[in-house]
């Protein structure tokens, strides 16, 4: 499990948090977060201000 710090912004909200994921992939304008074989979050790349792997 890897820990990531993510900062997301859109017209409606701003969000910063640390999340744990086994894998992160970028595909077709989306950043996809995996926990094993399951996707638990998909975010449009245009909303991601920063994404940093902490470990």
Locate each region found by the language model.
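Short, mixed-charge low-complexity intrinsically disordered segments
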Residues: 36-55
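A generic structural signal for short beta-strands and their flanking turns/coil linkers
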Residues: 2-4, 29, 39, 47
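Short linear sequence elements within intrinsically disordered, low-complexity coil regions
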Residues: 9, 18-20, 38-39, 45
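Hydrophobic beta-strand residues in large extracellular and virion-surface proteins
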Residues: 4-6, 21, 33, 48-51
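A short beta-strand micro-motif
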Residues: 2-12
């Amino acid at each position: 499990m890897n820990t990531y710090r993510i900062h997301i912004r859109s017209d409606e909200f701003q969000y910063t948090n640390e999340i744990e994921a086994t894998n992160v992939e970028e595909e077709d304008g989306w950043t996809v977060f995996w926990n094993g074989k399951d996707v638990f979050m998909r975010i449009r790349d245009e909303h991601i201000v920063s994404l940093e792997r902490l470990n």
